[in-house]
A protein has these predicted regions:
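Short hydrophobic segments within beta-strands
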Residues: 6-7, 31, 76, 126, ...
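A contiguous active-site-proximal alpha/beta segment in oxidoreductase catalytic domains
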Residues: 103-166
């Protein structure tokens, strides 16, 4: 299979480049407005590169005219550009593999469905946490518990801290209109996995929301989840990790920080084998993140995450 890519200079692009290479396929061409794409030398030094979208599209059209089919477009760009870049790929006759979240507004999912139908191509969302070995094992354990007690509600605490420097607040990520905010950036994959494991949303609250952290309580069909996401190193406590991602279920801790290296490769394998996750799979977590983004903050209570109960002056 031949691939094209938009955003080959982005921080997430190497995971996609490795997945394309390690599944035995080739990157024909890529586009990025920035030309710091030396990473291509490691994976596909012979691929074409463009900094102008019109030149990129012209190359795609010429390739098609010559009978060279470019099958997939990988989208590795900032979140607010995803819809336009997915539409670009479909319009140019490619299936699209896009970083999570696919879009910020759930109403755009239906628009993408219409475009899929129009162009007869698929849009795939990367939901790597669903493929994590601990998630798969947990899915079986939860099923077993619910077989015994269909009304069971699991008690869960999630803490996700990913330390970022001052650059973050000058980047597109700090703009909620472009990134969706921390609950979307850090949470959409986790929310997707929780919905996959524990069922639909019954209620939700936000207990703390600041530029560097957000947290609340999520009530699902089979889980009560207190959650907290942060980019502030002061929230790390004594831990020395750059990324801290922990889930505690009924007192048992699951470390979701490890073993991520192969999840993108496995995601690509499944997509290329006519599997993968589509628009319907992505919808629930995008809708939840959108709704959380539009909630007012409620005072924390005894059910809230401990870090939601601390004031900034207490850190």
């Amino acid at each position: 299979m031949l691939f094209a890519m938009i955003g080959s200079g982005g921080f997430i692009a190497p995971k996609h480049l490795q997945a394309i290479r390690d599944t035995g396929h080739f990157l024909d061409c890529s586009f990025d407005v920035h030309d710091s794409v030396g990473v291509l030398d490691e994976y596909f030094p012979q691929s074409e590169f463009f900094t102008n979208i019109e030149d990129f599209e012209k190359h795609l059209e010429q390739s098609k005219a010559m009978g060279k089919e470019i099958n997939y477009l990988s989208v590795c760009t900032p979140t607010h550009t995803h819809f336009d870049h997915i539409r670009f790929g479909l319009r140019n006759g490619m299936h699209v593999i896009c970083e999570t979240p696919l879009v910020l507004d759930p109403s755009e999912i239906q628009e993408l469905k219409d475009l899929e139908m129009k162009h007869q191509k698929r849009v795939f969302s990367l939901l790597p946490l669903r493929l994590h070995c601990d998630t798969l094992a947990l899915k079986e354990k939860i099923k077993s518990e619910l077989d015994k007690n269909p009304e069971k509600v699991f008690d869960i605490t999630i803490t996700y801290i990913s330390i970022q420097g001052k650059w973050y607040f000058s980047s597109w990520r700090a703009d909620v209109n472009r990134s969706g905010g921390l609950a979307t950036q850090m949470g959409v994959n986790i929310f997707d996995t929780l919905l996959y494991l524990f069922g639909g949303v019954k209620d939700k609250v936000i207990n703390r929301e600041e530029p560097d952290c957000v947290g609340g309580i999520l009530f699902l069909e089979h889980a009560k989840i207190r959650w907290f996401f942060s980019i502030n190193p002061e929230h790390m406590g004594v831990a020395k990790e750059k990324v801290y991602r922990r889930m505690i279920i009924e007192g048992e801790e699951i470390n979701l920080t490890q073993s991520f290296d192969n999840l993108y490769i496995e995601s690509y394998k499944q997509i290329l084998a006519q599997g993968g996750f589509g628009l319907d799979d992505a919808m629930a977590s995008i809708k939840l993140a959108y709704e959380l983004r539009n909630l007012s903050v409620s005072e924390p209570n005894e059910d809230s995450h401990v870090l939601c109960c601390k004031n900034k002056t207490d850190q």
